[in-house]
Every structure is written in structure tokens, then in C-alpha cells.
Design a protein with these regions (language model features):
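Short, solvent-exposed amphipathic alpha-helical segments in soluble enzyme
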Residues: 51-52, 154-160, 204-206
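Redox- and metal-dependent alpha/beta enzyme cores, enriched for Fe-S-associated oxidoreductases
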Residues: 133-179
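Glycine-rich phosphate-binding loop signature in dinucleotide/nucleotide-binding domains
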Residues: 181-184
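Short glycine-rich, flexible loops that bind phosphorylated cofactors or substrates
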Residues: 102, 196-198
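Electropositive, gly/pro-rich neighborhoods at or near active sites that engage anionic ligands
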Residues: 1-145, 149-153
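Short, flexible loop segments at boundaries between secondary-structure elements
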Residues: 208-223
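Glycine-rich anion-binding loop/nest that anchors nucleotide
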Residues: 187-195, 213
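Short Gly/Thr/Asp-enriched flexible loops that form oxyanion-binding sites at enzyme active sites
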Residues: 198-208
Length: 223
């Protein structure tokens, strides 16, 4: 296990190196997707490994937290399928680094990827870094449960530069993918639950869009 963790550390692209990769893809109009997974995704997969029925809906959280996480009425089997699809199709995968020292948060027990990224990039990039990325993209589409977040981007950057799609539950994912792929925005910032992470690569593939899973760090990106 220690060797596997060392291998993960050696293969993880740093926050600042990944910023250069993102800027390059924006400059040449190439597609890129990155998804982040945190401790909650590790817990869901561990629940399944411990014997949770794939036909049961997600348990072990309050109804309020499940609703906030966009996982209302999803089964363990469906969320596991969607998480696997997300990792298999994304260009870059940013698992929580907690798994390096805590076995119960070790996402790479369940998923692996050739291109790993430091999970903290979305929070670590400074305001100047974020502005540089937004300026390089010129146009940005925000996908988030809170319409106020979308309104803020559109007021700050104007409606010509910023778009918004609402995503508040996993069963909205397919509709969001279809709409996002048809829109012209070059950069897509999204916050999606374990049941909707796969929208990142699905939106990016073949569109020339750079799609970044910023998750709970979305407020840091407010211009």
C-alpha cells in the first residue's frame, strides 16, 4: 500500500503545472476535462465495498445533506456507475490527497487514472491566476445549483461573456450536458455531486471546451 501511495504522489501533477496545461488548452482551443473527488466519494465507495446494497438509495447522511449534495433518490449502484464513468472518461483526475495517509479516504482503491492532479488546485490558484484563466477563455459557462452564483458571473462579466445552467440534482445531468455542449462558451466551471461528475468529460469531448470541476470552491471564482 505504501508503494502505491508513493506511486500516486510521483504521478500527481502540481497545482501550478496544471494551470499551465489549462492555459495551453485554452490558447489552442483544445478540449480538456478535470474532475475532483473528495472524501464523500470515497465514503460512498467504501459503503459499497462494506456491503451496501446497490439497489438501496444513499444512506448515512441527513436528508438535508443528501439534498444539498444533489444525491436525492440515487442508488448506490447508480452513483458508483456514474463515478466510474467520470474517472474513465475524464482527461485528468484529481482525487482527494487525504487517501495518501487515511485508508478510509483512499479513492485509488476504487479508481485510478494515468493523469492525476493535486486536488487542491481549485482553491490554491490565486485571484490573479483565476483572472488569467478567465481572460484567456474570454467566455465562461457556470454550472451550479445556486442561481445567485450564475447571476453574479453574468453581472460582473456581462451576459456576452458568462452563461449559466442550473444543476441541483444528479437526474438533471443529461439535460445539462446537452445544453452545455450546444453553447459557445470556451471555459466551463461546474459544481456537481458524485452522481453528476461525469458531465465534465461529456461536455468537453470534441467541443474544444476546457471543463473544470471546481466544486465547493466556486465562490472563490466569483469575479
Amino acid at each position: 500500500v505504501i508503494q502505491r501511495h508513493l506511486d500516486q504522489a510521483h504521478r500527481t501533477i502540481s497545482t501550478w503545472a496544471f494551470k499551465l496545461i489549462v492555459l495551453h488548452h485554452l490558447s489552442v482551443g483544445a478540449s480538456l476535462s478535470v474532475i475532483r473527488m473528495q472524501d464523500v466519494e470515497a465514503k460512498i465507495m467504501q459503503d459499497i465495498a462494506d456491503g451496501a446494497s446497490l439497489s438501496d438509495t444513499i444512506q448515512g447522511y441527513s436528508d438535508e445533506l443528501i439534498a444539498w449534495s444533489g444525491l436525492t433518490d440515487i442508488t448506490y449502484g447508480e452513483v458508483a456507475r456514474r463515478m466510474k464513468l467520470a474517472v474513465e472518461t475524464t482527461d485528468y483526475f484529481a482525487p482527494s490527497l487525504s487517501g495518501l495517509i487515511r485508508p478510509d479516504y483512499d479513492l485509488l482503491k476504487f479508481f485510478d487514472h494515468a493523469r492525476l492532479v493535486d486536488n487542491g488546485f481549485a482553491a490554491a490558484w490565486s485571484k490573479e491566476d483565476r483572472t488569467e484563466i478567465l481572460d484567456a477563455a474570454h467566455t465562461v459557462l457556470v454550472i451550479h445549483a445556486n442561481t445567485g452564483v450564475g447571476d453574479h458571473f453574468q453581472r460582473s462579466l456581462t451576459y456576452h461573456r458568462a452563461g449559466y445552467l442550473k444543476l441541483s440534482n444528479w437526474d438533471q445531468a443529461e439535460s445539462v450536458i446537452e445544453k452545455a455542449r450546444a453553447l459557445p462558451h470556451r471555459l466551463v466551471l461546474f459544481a456537481g455531486s458524485a452522481g453528476a461528475k461525469y458531465i465534465g468529460p461529456a461536455i468537453a469531448h470534441g467541443t474544444g471546451k476546457v471543463v473544470i470541476d471546481v466544486g465547493v470552491q466556486m465562490e472563490k471564482w466569483l469575479p
